């Protein structure tokens, strides 16, 4: 087993290492004081607030808060701006991610436990993870569970390690959890095994031997191993546990004995496979405790092996006649109706089955069951819309209606002509008509309803099956016939005008759903009672919110009357003015029950506001509910305007302005409801006097309306956009029937044809292209950056709404190539958002089967509603389907169907909210402190957010009467967002997007935007490899260019080469013991390898922690787009680490100087404080290449940050290499200096300058201001005669001579402003002395001599190797240095041409040492190695104890020998080119074996 990481002794990552982190988690940005310099900053102000758990509440907390505290809230007008202002943007919107994105890797924790310590929960976690792997396909659950209980976890650190040799004895069965291995067979053939594949023994105790040699292909390969003995025992045990059911000599069913836990209490037989007939019969047999979901699983999946549901239906009707089976049959039917009512709706045969079953229940006097069945039908029935046309108004209606508000019912269809269009449209007996042509029919007199239906030739009707109440209506009518007197409501009368639209009383759930039909005399809409209630309400100001909205109702318990609120209670007058529930026996009463179960309708609370105008343009705000009619609004408006006339003289008119400027005016029907939802942004409601014909809206007002209705994304609140996206997504998500997943997966033909599923599937593409379209259509660069920033904030709010689908779509949109290439736009984005973006996309790191995302999803505090990432759902289901056979031995593989059903149930639970989703997504506003905007059409949306104080909920009293204007503005913003989203014009064609992208930023270079994280462009020679961190991206290689030299300058901006997996130290292959040296057995081999890796880790704690400092900044190799575009967000602590915008791995934030046409600045002040011991500089004056070497030792407590020198230290050594390029000095010509500056300017992504904010737009200016003015030695003479190494080794003596004043100046500056932008722009001057060569090879970065010979100096391999000597012939130099800015502008013309900067050398593309390089032209055929190979090579770390002698050069793993292993290269002493430096050596080369030395 892989031991846990040793406790950190540096105090920075100790928190993290208490438990071993998985490979990909250690790459997350941890906020545990990674940078001591920013430890005083609260998490709310740190750059990475998304990972800070500063006590901010998760949605579930807020939800609970709303439940318990709703009654205490005071809602008096609280200030809130409708749109996020720039000021709060950075402060508030971003700082309250609901919980950290990083969570523990639970699976890893379980694996690392000793098998005997694993609990049942641990095994369940492992089972959940393992069942998706192909290796476990076709195994039964019990086998998997047993294997999970005994598996041992092993990690092999390094790529290229031999796991098994040919002919070795095998002693385990292993499955790959992460990474891949390659098996090379003796005949030369090779096979690659990747995640989920298995290798090793078969389930027998015979000796087996390895065929071929197995090597790891990548670092950090993870395996689980099961010893041969255990594997054999478990797989052979299966047969013993099997129970076969035979009929007529044939096996018809196979069951397996299972124990679900170790207590022995949950054990029994579970169906594994069987014939379709036998499985159907099992529905009414006894089910064991270990198979509680058989009926649900069967009812969901029968469609995969039965051609028609009637096959089951007929059997059930048959079995119903057997008294012993009757209860079981009834239970099956109730579950069927409750879970899959869509099987019955629209299927005439199944509808007849249901009717026959109801008749059977009535016949057997099973009233309770019948009642439950009717309740389930009513609750599960969905609204259906249909359109009917009549040839003329006089044409008779093709159906007969019953009911009406005078009887206390809705309008019901009693019968339909069988040959009419209505039947074809799907209208049937028992349907309740809810709406006709937009007019609410839930509370209307029958005569009025008939009049509306007769007077229209075009009828758009919304209906819903409601047999439960329809039967109640029929019973009432038959009673009336018998008694001869109509039933009259006893309490009050039904004058509509007396209805108040302000709720009368806070209601308990029982009251909401307790409008039971027991007391049939009651009327919900009473006058006397309501007036009393109104007075009470006015006096007491009781909150309008339910104290516990639906908290006490269990969702899945629909079979119990008391649960659905239909218990026999004394009548409680309806306190809610729900116009649909005007009678206790009204059909929609069921909707109160329905709300608990489904919430497709919402309680009638006045959570909406209308703004009503008069002809003189005065306006008033009127509080209404969703069901308030136009007539009621007129009554309220008359009261608000203090008009004396009667309501009959006035009507409500809608005035709207078309985009062409045409003013339209129409009178609204009195019964029209949902008024707040109907009004357009370009429309207004007017109170119109019917007697007058005045113009309601002048032309000026119309123009203003038109202007208001034109909206752009930047005008919209990011919170509101995220809320509306979430509501829209959630509506689509929860409408998906469980059967649609099955139909889609098994490609079954169904009535619905998976329409809801397809819609939800399309949303992710639409949202992705929306992001790209919005950004690329904006021509202004600054606005483009703001739109990107806006989208990052929207994604963040989607994260808070637990809308992972939209979050992923937005991230994908920002990563689309046409958006990703907008280099200068991304550079303007503030670092904070870069960091947030990286954190957001880090969540979707695909490694280990999306382990991070799955961890968050399975987190304890993630309660519904959740909108999961749909592609992952689809992948999991496809995996289960394709990884397991549907039939085994001719029998239906029910184990497979059970797993699929379980997965679908799990997905369904995410949509099972017991509160209106609009409210759930709505309870978040900035800082949780201001008035929550109320949803358009959401009932309880007035439940407010909770002020957060140190993570504790602060209870605040608020008045229950809301500030209507504030609510209106909120609703108006919601309306704007809705209109914006509904009118989106998407550009779905990637070629068109690319064209738009090129119009925004023409291609000045073929490179991707920031290599640090824009998507790499594929080239023939360099396959794009996964990115390993903020600084590491595959760069396009110039096919014919030899590897480009790369040089380090400073340790100040440089972390010693770090590994990608900090907690797993890499060591050179030569230091590894032979694989399996401790044991001839495979299981122990993998484990021993894993343990040796950890021993290395303990030995190299120092290096390890350095690794951590940098790796914390890197994100997983495969994350969608893994890094900030401008280097590290570490610059927060005042560092200039963000220079390295190159393709070098995060292993060197240090980067190539020559290739980047820039010099790092070297920290010289605070040497003791930073423990920077000394540096060595060698300058190759003949080549014109300045090289500076820095050797550093850092004390343990400084590891994580020591190497990130603060900006204040980095100023001193500017251009030092230019001064001391040899024992004498050389004049820096104007031409060279200026070219250096310009090359840096034009280097695009290759240079450090591209990192600094805004530096690209006016690079010359910056260079002018920063570069030259900061040279304090424009015409200074130096008479220092010591040799160069002496100067550097002296701890910065020369620096102090040269730069003491400027160093202090910058120290002061930096302490006074910690602004990122300034730090970055100041940083840009450090890169201006780039090429020292006479000539620069345009796009390759190869330095040429004047004589035309290429010299490819050795590139850094980002590894810990000793300093090497370089070729440098002493050239006499005048002691005069002239540096003037005068010629900076002279070279601008050359900027776009051949002096464009090349892509920087990717890590691991190691150059050929000068000593090996033949004189003469370069070899065009020489190609770099595969990027992956180079990357792995770049992680080889030389052990400090083996630092070679001063004369040695670093490993010469050259680009032309991709297969070679690192080896020490000993240059020939006789090589004349090395002569000048041979005797000199390095002053401090052997001074301290622990020092980290950078390679050049």
From Swiss-Prot:
PTM per Swiss-Prot/TrEMBL: Ubiquitinated by NEDD4, leading to proteasomal degradation. Phosphorylation by PLK2 promotes its activity.
Keyword Membrane: yes
Effect upon mutating residue 806 to A: Blocks the gel mobility shift induced by PLK2 and affects stimulation by PLK2
InterPro entries referenced in this protein's UniProt entry, alphabetically: cNMP-bd_dom, cNMP-bd_dom_sf, PDZ, PDZ_sf, RA_dom, Ras-like_Gua-exchang_fac_N, Ras_GEF_dom_sf, RASGEF_cat_dom
Tissue specificity as recorded in UniProt: Expressed in the brain, heart, lung, liver and stomach. Expressed in the granular layer of the cerebellum. Expressed in Purkinje cells. Expressed in cortical neurons and coronary artery smooth muscle cells (at protein level). Expressed ubiquitously in the brain.
Signal peptide: none
GO biological process: adenylate cyclase-activating adrenergic receptor signaling pathway; adenylate cyclase-modulating G protein-coupled receptor signaling pathway; blood vessel development; brain-derived neurotrophic factor receptor signaling pathway; cellular response to cAMP; cellular response to cGMP; cellular response to nerve growth factor stimulus; establishment of endothelial barrier
GO molecular function, one term: beta-1 adrenergic receptor binding
Effect of residue 1022 to A: Blocks the gel mobility shift induced by PLK2 and affects stimulation by PLK2
Compartments in which it is found: Cell membrane; Cytoplasm; Cytoplasm, Perinuclear region; Late endosome
Disulfide bonds: none
Consequence when changing residue 644 to A: Blocks the gel mobility shift induced by PLK2 and affects stimulation by PLK2
Positions bearing Phosphothreonine: 644
UniProt keyword Cytoplasm present: yes
Pfam families to which the protein is assigned, alphabetical: PDZ (PF00595), RA (PF00788), RasGEF (PF00617), RasGEF_N (PF00618)
Domain spans labelled N-terminal Ras-GEF: 267-380
Residue ranges of the region described as Disordered: 40-59, 68-101, 1003-1052, 1093-1127, 1139-1159, 1224-1256, 1304-1369, 1390-1496
Biased composition (Basic and acidic residues): 1227-1237
Modified residues (Phosphoserine): 501, 806, 930, 933, 1022, 1079, 1088, 1094, 1115, 1119, 1158, 1175
Entry domain remark: The Ras-associating domain is necessary for the Rap guanine nucleotide exchange activity. The N-terminal regionis necessary for cAMP-binding. The PDZ domain is necessary for its targeting to the cell membrane.
Quaternary state and interactors: Interacts (via C-terminal domain) with NEDD4 (via WW domains); this interaction leads to ubiquitination and degradation via the proteasome pathway in a cAMP-independent manner. Interacts with MAGI1 (via PDZ domain). Interacts with ADRB1 (via C-terminal PDZ motif); the interaction is direct. Interacts (via Ras-associating domain) with RAP1A (via GTP-bound active form). Interacts weakly with HRAS (via GDP- and GTP-bound forms). Interacts (via C-terminal domain) with MAGI2 (via PDZ and WW domains). Interacts with CDH1, CTNNB1 and TJP1.
Primary role: Functions as a guanine nucleotide exchange factor (GEF), which activates Rap and Ras family of small GTPases by exchanging bound GDP for free GTP in a cAMP-dependent manner. Serves as a link between cell surface receptors and Rap/Ras GTPases in intracellular signaling cascades. Also acts as an effector for Rap1 by direct association with Rap1-GTP thereby leading to the amplification of Rap1-mediated signaling. Shows weak activity on HRAS. It is controversial whether RAPGEF2 binds cAMP and cGMP or not.
Family: Belongs to the RAPGEF2 family.
Protein name, as recorded: Rap guanine nucleotide exchange factor 2
């Amino acid at each position: 087993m892989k031991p846990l990481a040793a406790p950190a002794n540096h105090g920075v990552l100790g928190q993290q290492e208490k438990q071993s982190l998985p490979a990909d988690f250690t790459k997350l940005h941890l906020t545990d004081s990674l940078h001591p310099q920013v430890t005083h900053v609260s998490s709310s102000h740190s750059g990475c607030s998304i990972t800070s758990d500063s006590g901010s509440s998760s949605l579930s907390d807020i939800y609970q808060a709303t439940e318990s505290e709703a009654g205490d809230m005071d809602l008096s007008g609280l200030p809130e701006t409708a749109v996020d202002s720039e000021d709060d943007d950075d402060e508030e919107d971003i700082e309250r991610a609901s919980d950290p994105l990083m969570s523990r890797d639970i699976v890893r924790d379980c694996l690392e436990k000793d098998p005997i310590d694993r609990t049942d929960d641990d095994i369940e976690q492992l089972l959940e993870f393992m069942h998706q792997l192909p290796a476990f396909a076709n195994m039964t659950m019990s086998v998997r569970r047993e294997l999970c209980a005994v598996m041992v976890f092993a990690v092999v650190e390094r790529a290229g390690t031999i796991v098994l040799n040919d002919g070795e004895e095998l002693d385990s069965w292993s499955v790959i959890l992460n990474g891949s291995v390659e098996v090379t067979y003796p005949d030369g053939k090779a096979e690659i095994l990747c995640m989920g594949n298995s290798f090793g023994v078969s389930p027998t105790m015979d000796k087996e031997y390895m065929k071929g040699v197995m090597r790891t292909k990548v670092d950090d390969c993870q395996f689980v191993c099961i010893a041969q003995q255990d594997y054999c025992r478990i797989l052979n045990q299966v047969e013993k546990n099997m129970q076969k059911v035979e009929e007529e000599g044939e096996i018809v069913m196979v069951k397996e004995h299972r124990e679900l836990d170790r207590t022995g209490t949950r054990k029994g037989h579970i169906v594994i496979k069987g014939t379709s007939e036998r499985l159907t019969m099992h529905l009414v047999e006894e089910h064991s405790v270990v198979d509680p979901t058989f009926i649900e699983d069967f009812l969901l999946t029968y469609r995969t092996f039965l051609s028609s549901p009637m096959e089951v239906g007929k059997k059930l009707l048959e079995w119903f006649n057997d008294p012993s089976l009757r209860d079981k049959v009834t239970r099956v039917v109730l579950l069927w109706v409750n879970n899959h009512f869509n099987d019955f709706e629209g299927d005439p045969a199944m509808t007849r089955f249901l009717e026959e079953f109801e008749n059977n229940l009535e016949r057997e006097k099973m009233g309770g069951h019948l009642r439950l069945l009717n309740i389930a039908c009513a609750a599960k029935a969905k609204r259906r819309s249909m359109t009917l046309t009549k040839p003329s108004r006089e044409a008779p209606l093709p159906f007969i209606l019953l009911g009406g508000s005078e009887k206390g019912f809705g309008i019901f269809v009693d019968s339909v002509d069988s040959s009419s269009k209505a039947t074809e449209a799907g209208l049937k007996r028992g349907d309740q008509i809810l709406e006709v042509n937009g007019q609410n029919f839930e509370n209307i007199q029958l005569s009025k309803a008939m009049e509306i239906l007769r007077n229209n030739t075009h009828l758009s009707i919304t209906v819903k099956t409601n047999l439960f109440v329809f039967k109640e209506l029929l019973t009432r009518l038959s009673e009336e016939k018998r008694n001869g007197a109509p039933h009259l409501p006893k309490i009050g009368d039904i004058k509509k005008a007396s209805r108040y639209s302000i709720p009368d009383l806070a209601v308990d759930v029982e009251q909401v759903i307790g409008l039971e039909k027991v007391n049939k005399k009651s009327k919900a809409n009473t006058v006397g009672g309501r007036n009393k209630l109104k007075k009470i309400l006015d006096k007491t100001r009781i909150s309008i919110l339910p104290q516990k909205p639906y908290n006490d109702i269990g969702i899945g318990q629909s079979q119990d009357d008391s649960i659905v609120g239909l218990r026999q209670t004394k009548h409680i007058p309806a306190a809610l003015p729900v116009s649909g529930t005007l009678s206790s026996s009204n059909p929609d009463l069921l909707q109160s029950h329905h709300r608990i179960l489904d919430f497709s309708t919402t309680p009638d609370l006045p959570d909406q506001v209308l703004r009503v105008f008069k002809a003189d343009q005065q306006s008033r705000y009127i509080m209404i509910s969703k069901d308030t009619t136009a007539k009621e609004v007129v009554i309220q408006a008359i009261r608000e305007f203090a008009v004396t006339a009667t309501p009959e003289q006035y009507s409500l008119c809608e005035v709207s302005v078309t985009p062409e400027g045409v003013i339209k005016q129409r009178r609204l029907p009195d019964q029209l409801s949902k008024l707040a939802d109907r009004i357009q942004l370009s429309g207004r409601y007017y109170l119109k006097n019917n007697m007058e014909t005045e113009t309601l809206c002048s032309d000026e007002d119309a123009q203003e309306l038109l202007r208001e209705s034109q909206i752009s994304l930047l005008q919209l609140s990011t919170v509101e956009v995220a809320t509306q996206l979430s509501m829209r997504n959630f509506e689509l998500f929860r409408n998906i029937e469980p059967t649609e997943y099955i139909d889609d997966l098994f490609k079954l033909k169904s009535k619905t044809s998976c329409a809801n599923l397809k819609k939800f599937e399309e949303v992710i593409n639409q949202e992705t292209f929306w992001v790209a379209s919005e950004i690329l259509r904006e021509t202004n660069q600054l606005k483009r950056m703001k739109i990107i920033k806006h989208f990052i904030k929207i994604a963040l709010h989607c994260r808070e709404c637990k809308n992972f689908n939209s979050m992923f779509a937005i991230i994908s949109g920002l990563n689309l190539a046409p958006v990703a290439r907008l280099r200068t736009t991304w550079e303007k984005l503030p670092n904070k958002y870069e960091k947030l973006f990286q954190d957001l996309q880090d969540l979707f790191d695909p490694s280990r089967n999306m382990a991070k995302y799955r961890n968050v999803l399975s987190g304890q505090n993630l309660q519904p509603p959740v909108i999961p990432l749909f592609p992952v759902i689809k992948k999991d289901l496809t995996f289960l389907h394709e990884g397991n056979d549907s039939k085994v031995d001719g029998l239906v593989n029910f184990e497979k169907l059970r797993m699929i059903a379980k997965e679908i149930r799990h997905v369904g639970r995410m949509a099972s909210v017991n509160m209106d989703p609009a409210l759930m997504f709505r309870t978040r506003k900035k800082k949780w402190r201001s008035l929550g905007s109320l949803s358009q059409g959401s009932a309880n949306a007035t439940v407010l957010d909770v002020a957060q104080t140190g993570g504790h909920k602060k209870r605040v009293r608020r008045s229950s009467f809301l500030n209507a204007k504030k609510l209106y503005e909120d609703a108006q913003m919601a309306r704007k967002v809705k209109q914006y989203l509904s009118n989106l014009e998407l550009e779905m064609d990637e070629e068109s997007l690319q064209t738009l992208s090129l119009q925004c930023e023409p291609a000045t270079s073929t490179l991707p935007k920031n290599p640090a994280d824009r998507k790499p462009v594929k080239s023939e020679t360099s396959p794009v490899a996964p990115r390993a961190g903020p600084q590491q991206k595959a760069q396009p290689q110039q096919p014919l260019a030899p590897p480009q030299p790369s040089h380090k300058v400073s340790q100040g901006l440089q972390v010693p080469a770090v590994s990608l997996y900090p907690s797993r130290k890499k060591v050179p292959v030569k230091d590894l013991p032979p694989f399996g040296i401790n044991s001839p057995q495979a299981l122990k081999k993998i484990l021993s390898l894993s343990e040796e890796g950890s021993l290395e880790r303990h030995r190299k704690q120092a290096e390890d922690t350095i690794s951590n400092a940098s790796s914390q900044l890197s994100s997983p190799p495969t994350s969608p787009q893994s890094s900030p575009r401008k280097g590290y967000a570490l610059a927060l602590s005042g560092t200039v680490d963000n220079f390295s915008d190159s393709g070098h791995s995060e292993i060197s934030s240090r980067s190539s100087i020559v290739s980047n046409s820039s010099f790092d600045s070297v920290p010289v002040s605070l040497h003791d404080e930073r423990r920077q011991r000394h540096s060595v500089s060698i300058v190759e004056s003949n080549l014109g290449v300045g090289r500076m070497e820095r050797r550093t030792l850092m004390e343990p407590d400084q590891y994580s940050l020591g190497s990130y020198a603060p900006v204040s230290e980095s100023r001193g050594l500017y251009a030092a290499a230019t001064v001391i390029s040899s024992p004498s000095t050389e004049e820096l010509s104007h031409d060279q200096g200026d070219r250096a500056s310009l090359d840096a300017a034009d280097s695009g992504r290759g240079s450090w300058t591209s990192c600094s904010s805004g530096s690209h737009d006016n690079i010359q200016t910056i260079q002018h201001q920063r570069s030259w003015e900061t040279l304090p030695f424009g015409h200074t003479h130096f008479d220092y005669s010591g040799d160069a190494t002496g100067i550097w080794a002296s701890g910065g003596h020369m620096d102090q001579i040269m730069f003491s004043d400027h160093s202090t100046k910058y120290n002061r500056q930096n302490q006074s402003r910690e602004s990122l932008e300034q730090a970055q722009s100041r940083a840009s001057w450090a890169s201006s002395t780039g090429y020292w060569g006479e000539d620069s090879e345009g796009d390759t970065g190869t330095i040429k001599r004047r004589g035309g010979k290429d010299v490819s100096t050795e590139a850094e391999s980002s590894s810990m190797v000793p300093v090497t000597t370089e070729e440098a012939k002493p050239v006499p130099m005048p002691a005069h240095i002239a540096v003037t800015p005068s010629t900076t502008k002279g070279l601008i013309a050359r900027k776009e041409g051949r002096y464009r900067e090349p892509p920087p050398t990717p890590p691991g593309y190691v150059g050929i040492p000068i000593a090996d390089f033949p004189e003469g032209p370069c070899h065009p055929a020489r190609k770099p190695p595969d990027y992956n190979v180079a990357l792995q090579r770049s992680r080889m770390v030389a052990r400090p104890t083996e630092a070679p002698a001063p004369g040695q050069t670093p490993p010469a793993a050259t680009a032309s020998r991709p297969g070679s292993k690192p080896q020490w290269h000993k240059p020939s002493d006789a090589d004349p080119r090395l002569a000048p430096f041979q005797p000199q050596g390095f002053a401090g080369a052997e001074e301290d074996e622990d020092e980290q030395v950078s390679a050049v």
